[in-house]
Amino acid sequence: MRTQVIIEDHVLPQLLTSAIEAYEVSHRAHARGRSNKKLETFGLLWGYALPVRNGVPARLVAVVATVETSALRHTDWVRPDFESIAMKRDFFGEYWPQLELIGTFHSHPYEDLSEVNDTKGWRASEGDRAFWPDFHEFVCPDMDELAHLVIAITGLSRKGTAEPDRLAGNEYTSGYVVSADKRKLWIKGYTSALYEEVDEDAPFDEAFMAGDIEMGRSYDVYEDEDVLLEIPSLEARFRHELLRR
């Protein structure tokens, strides 16, 4: 059954501005250090994980986003610090226990529009697909599903006028594209899921009969028709100027 990934209104500016800042603003390790732009950024999604119930699909609802400022950032990759992630998870668990770590987001910066289109830059890379299951297993091993967002960004030569829209084809349910001044952004959603099955090599003994069954675990990535990304405020904020006044 398709999983709904819901991004609440106040989370959207956190996602977009973190990608824009990493793309447009110079970053230095110190005042006289080398300046870098068009970097990837990485962050975490916090909120609620609602299971399948009465025919309603599983939902991952993001209500807060935090940026991993300790992550190593490059134009082609980003590497989060897992100690930082563990610290934040403990901090939320202590003071906001009602919120769970439900996923990640990171950006894909591109030089121009043609590069994005040629490479389908809004899609997850092979590295992303390998990283998400490992992240799921290491950080949130008992979560049934996690959401993962890719935010692609590029600059435009003039102010974009295209209204926000869903991605085309079989990616329609899982992503959006939007113009914001002299930049264009794509947001595409994925999920990683935990699967448990009986270990075929487990002995058929008294413990097995008593329900103490060894389970094998694996984590896989899902996309497109298996993911429904919902950002209700995106179309309203970017389509209707009245809401921005």
Each predicted region: which residue ranges?
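MPN/JAMM (Mov34/JAB) isopeptidase/deubiquitinase module and associated MPN-bearing subunits/adaptors
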Residues: M1-G103, S107-R245
